[in-house]
Design a protein with these regions (language model features):
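Active-site metal-binding loops of divalent metal-dependent hydrolases
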Residues: 57, 182-184, 205
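General beta-strand structural signal in soluble alpha/beta enzymes
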Residues: 22-27, 180, 202-203
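Conserved phosphate-binding catalytic cores of ATP/NTP-utilizing and phosphoryl-transfer enzymes
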Residues: 25-50, 218
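A short helix-loop
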Residues: 43-47, 53-55, 60-145, 225-226
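Glycine-rich phosphate-binding/hydrolytic loop that grips phosphoryl groups
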Residues: 31-33, 203-226
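A contiguous, well-structured pocket-lining segment that forms one wall/lid of small-molecule binding clefts
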Residues: 108-177, 184-201, 220-226
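Short glycine-aspartate micro-motif
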Residues: 3, 49-53, 179
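Short beta-strand-loop/turn "lid" adjacent to the catalytic site in phosphate-handling enzymes
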Residues: 1-12, 16
């Protein structure tokens, strides 16, 4: 992605100046390794597992396998076909008058709701669609539903979509460990639901939105095999 080119250029210049090796990887691998580190599950790099990268720009499930050269390889096996999870959350928050980015404030607001929503996510094979969440939220606001109920509905909708993706991937590829990374995975309600259902591992909040630790881990592991 173009936004990463500045960092890549700076790394190339620093490596050349220091006469140090330069290891290149992906933004996604950084998030996955950061999640494994903070969840205390670094040993999973030695076996296949499912990793979810859930943020404002990405809502994907990837099949991760060990690789002798790249440490791990990630193959996308399920994703959102339209709106991303973080977008659904932020757009809901903005519609409710919350400051952007809205995740923590929307979660706090949702905790005031006593509603128990029964939500059937929209699935297209193994992929999910989240565009309907925004439309439903707009309708709820027009119907004068309380803000806390609207907030809880949006978060429950995202959680159920991720759950349905996990079910679809497990059915297709078999039962294996599941790890969640990315900013949205820092949401406690979503994390609690998916941990209960699948025994999923989650990055700690401070490692959910920042993948710098994962990039550092990748560089360390690569240095061991050079």
């Amino acid at each position: 992605m173009p936004c990463f080119l500045a960092g890549e250029s700076a790394a190339e210049a620093a490596a050349a100046f220091c006469n140090a090796p330069l290891f290149k990887t992906s933004h996604q691998v950084g998030h996955i390794l950061a999640a494994l580190y903070s969840a205390g599950k670094p040993e999973l790099i030695n076996e296949p597992f499912i990793a979810f990268h859930v943020s404002g720009g990405t809502t994907e499930a990837v099949l991760v396998t060990p690789d002798d050269y790249e440490i791990i390889k990630a193959q996308i096996v399920s994703e959102s076909t339209d709106l991303k999870a973080g977008q659904a959350i932020d757009r809901t928050g903005v519609l409710l008058g919350l400051d952007f980015p809205c995740g923590p404030a929307l979660e706090k607001l949702s905790n005031e709701s006593n509603e128990n929503f029964k939500i059937k996510p929209t699935m297209l094979g193994v992929n999910c669609s989240l565009s309907g969440v925004e439309n439903k939220v707009k309708n709820m606001i027009s119907d004068n539903r309380t803000p806390c109920d609207v907030a809880k509905f949006a978060l429950c909708s995202v959680a159920e979509a991720l759950s349905a993706m996990a079910e679809a991937v497990i059915e297709k590829y078999g039962d294996m460990p599941i790890v969640f990374a990315g900013g949205v995975s820092g949401n406690k309600m979503i994390a609690d639901m998916l941990s209960d259902r699948y025994g999923a591992f989650f990055a700690k909040p401070e490692f959910s939105s920042d993948n710098a630790a994962g990039i550092a881990i990748y560089a360390y592991l690569k240095s061991l095999i050079q």
